[in-house]
Amino acid sequence: MDVVFALGGSVLMPKEGASTENIQNYAKAFKKLKEMGHRVSVVVGGGNTARQYISVAREFANESFCDEIGILATRMNSMLLISALGKDAVKQVPENFKDAEIILNMDKILVMGGTHPAHTTDAVSATLAEFIDADLLVIATNVDGVYNKDPRCNENAVKLDKINTKELLEITGSSSMSAGSSGVVDPLASKIIDRAKLKTIVVKGIPEEILASVTGNHNGTTITP
């Protein structure tokens, strides 16, 4: 199966900083999926690294410039994961989908970050999935699925086990799109998922759930066309 993962930068690089064990555990999960015969692509977010830099830069620069900072942060995080993957990855971060496809055709795990200003890595992963005609898009984030309301500020929010892409659009329609913003799925990614009719799964961004999203026994949200 051809699978694209959107790996949240905040789960790879939590607030407490880089952890060798944490990054190694993600690398092991992606390696295992490759060993099982799946073609694996990972788009890594900027997470806390991006937000820290952007919060300072925003005092001096516009949103477009802050977007560029965020893109660089995603590529630094990507390099960390690439280093842990060793021979299973190519030691460079592609900046466009054609170069990404070349890496996939080398039978390597593809790892990349952001590509364009105003595009989150969720949107990049959805576009990549459409570009390579992937079988599945998995969004691994710091929330364990899609909720009817933001669970981080609504204690009555209800997790949705299964929704369709139109329902996803309704839920994500009012999300923020400023540089460094974070949400379960951003509006642009939702539109691409709907347009491309991508089967998508949103899971808690831990190695166990990443594996489970492909084997079929995950605890997240399944989004169908």
From Swiss-Prot:
Regulation affecting activity: Inhibited by UTP.
EC identifiers of the protein: 2.7.4.22
GO cellular component: cytoplasm
InterPro entries: AceGlu_kinase-like_sf, Asp/Glu/Uridylate_kinase, Uridylate_kinase, Uridylate_kinase_arch/spir
Reactions it catalyzes: UMP + ATP = UDP + ADP
Associated pathway: Pyrimidine metabolism; CTP biosynthesis via de novo pathway; UDP from UMP (UMPK route): step 1/1
Binding residue positions for ATP: G9, S10, G47, R51, T141, N142, Y147, D150
Main location per the UniProt record: cytoplasm
Keyword ATP-binding: yes
Stretches that traverse the bilayer: none
GO molecular function terms listed in the Swiss-Prot or TrEMBL record: ATP binding; UMP kinase activity
Compartments where found: Cytoplasm
Cited function: Catalyzes the reversible phosphorylation of UMP to UDP.
Subunit structure: Homohexamer.
Full protein name: Uridylate kinase
Organism of derivation: Methanococcus maripaludis (strain DSM 14266 / JCM 13030 / NBRC 101832 / S2 / LL)
